[in-house]
From Swiss-Prot:
Belongs to the archaeal ATPase family. It comes from Methanocaldococcus jannaschii (strain ATCC 43067 / DSM 2661 / JAL-1 / JCM 10045 / NBRC 100440). This is Uncharacterized ATP-binding protein MJ0439. Gene3D superfamilies: P-loop containing nucleotide triphosphate hydrolases, Winged helix-like DNA-binding domain superfamily/Winged helix DNA-binding domain. Keywords: ATP-binding, Nucleotide-binding. The lineage of its organism: Archaea, Methanobacteriati, Methanobacteriota, Methanomada group, Methanococci. GO terms for molecular function: ATP binding; ATP hydrolysis activity. SUPFAM superfamilies: P-loop containing nucleoside triphosphate hydrolases. ATP binds at G41, P42, L43, N44, S45, G46, K47, T48.
Length: 361
């Protein structure tokens, strides 16, 4: 069992026992690029932490060049926004590959593709993805000539899902990523998303059939969650939890890493039952106000949504088609439910949400 952790600015940063997923991704990286990979899972299940661990600690820095484009927290509404996220402008009179070689000596990944100022101005002026993709491909080919394997990782890709530049930008990106992987075998591509509705749309997209694959980063199963509690209790509280205490924590928050961390941290100043009841009460209030807003606008919709949620009183996970498509898509979009398109199942985003549903309805 591997335990990997660090302290940054006094905060405990989670990373724990994702060896199965790490092994799968490292195996992909060792082969030739041939598919686009979508890394998905419930909210706060540890997707970004997993990728960060691989970038920072698991790959050979002399062999790979990683471009990690994080769209989280960035407002993208127009072409210029997209370009500014994708590229890093520089003014030196050097080739992009030379800039890249100098930068990767000090950092594990680059947050944008280095681009000379005059080139970036031309790209912005023409407003066409053709020039963008051509430039990126040339940079990636230069990296390959240097004996290194490029990797592109885009976090929260769904943020550009509705953006149009001569058609939907997302489809142009998909086509380009397929070209980089399945056609040219030039660059590994990973797309991260916690938006399971977006993943379902990708999964159903005919143009991507046999060109993409999926890696699920789910909340911990019970066995791993209990071991994670042992690990955190030793590190944060300098003591062990009893089996009953761990079972109680799991019954409230399940295997959601961030919620387990929150519980253990609060135990420094509060009792366990008080902490768990407080967290559940907070989740119930959020759900109550969410349903109240719906009821005020449309009582018929409220009744349908309440009926759908009541199905979870007996089961944590159900077949997706048990809930009408428009209702399930609404609940997934609002992050009440998580959809797994590969299994065709729905479940609450966390045990905490599940407990709130059971007690409120």
């Amino acid at each position: 069992m591997n335990y990997i952790y660090s302290f940054i600015n006094g905060d405990f940063m989670r990373f724990f026992n994702r060896e199965k997923e790490i092994t799968e991704i490292l195996s992909i990286l060792e082969g030739n690029p041939d598919l686009v990979y979508f890394v998905y899972g419930p909210l706060n299940s540890g997707k970004t932490a997993l990728i960060s661990e691989i970038i920072n600690n698991r790959i050979d820095k002399n062999k790979y060049v990683v471009f990690y484009i994080n769209l989280r927290g960035i407002f993208i509404s127009k072409y210029k926004d997209f370009i500014e996220v994708l590229f890093e402008e520089y003014e030196e009179d050097r080739k992009p590959v030379e800039i890249i070689k100098s930068l990767i000596k000090d950092v594990p990944s680059l947050c944008g593709i280095p681009t000379p100022k005059n080139t970036l101005e031309e790209i912005l002026k023409k407003k066409t993805t053709k020039n963008v993709f051509k430039y990126i491909t040339n940079v990636l080919m230069d990296i390959k000539k240097e004996g290194k394997q490029p990797i592109i990782i885009i976090d929260e890709l769904q943020k550009i899902g509705d953006m149009k530049i001569n058609g939907f930008l997302i489809y142009e990106l998909f086509n380009y990523f397929v070209d980089l992987t399945k056609e040219l075998h030039l660059c590994h591509v990973f797309c991260l998303s916690s938006d399971s509705l977006f993943i379902e749309q990708v999964y159903s997209e005919a143009m991507l059939k046999d060109r993409v694959d999926y890696i699920l980063v789910d909340d911990f199963d019970k066995e791993t969650a209990l071991k994670f509690m042992d690990f955190l209790a030793e590190e944060i509280l300098n003591k062990k939890l009893s089996d009953d205490e761990k079972e109680l924590i799991y019954s409230y928050v399940g295997g959601k890493p961030i919620l387990i961390i929150k519980v253990i941290k609060k135990l420094k100043i509060k009792g366990l039952k008080e902490t768990l009841d407080e967290m559940l009460r907070d989740e119930m209030q959020k759900l109550k106000y969410f349903l109240e807003d719906i009821k005020e606008k449309d009582e018929e919709s409220y009744n349908k949504i309440a009926d759908a949620l009541e199905i979870f009183k007996d089961s944590y996970e159900i077949e997706d088609i048990k809930i009408p498509k428009n209702i399930r898509e609404f609940l997934v979009k609002k992050n009440i439910l998580f959809l797994n398109p590969q299994k065709g199942t729905l479940k609450p985003q966390s045990y905490l949400v599940w407990n709130a549903i059971k007690r409120l309805l």
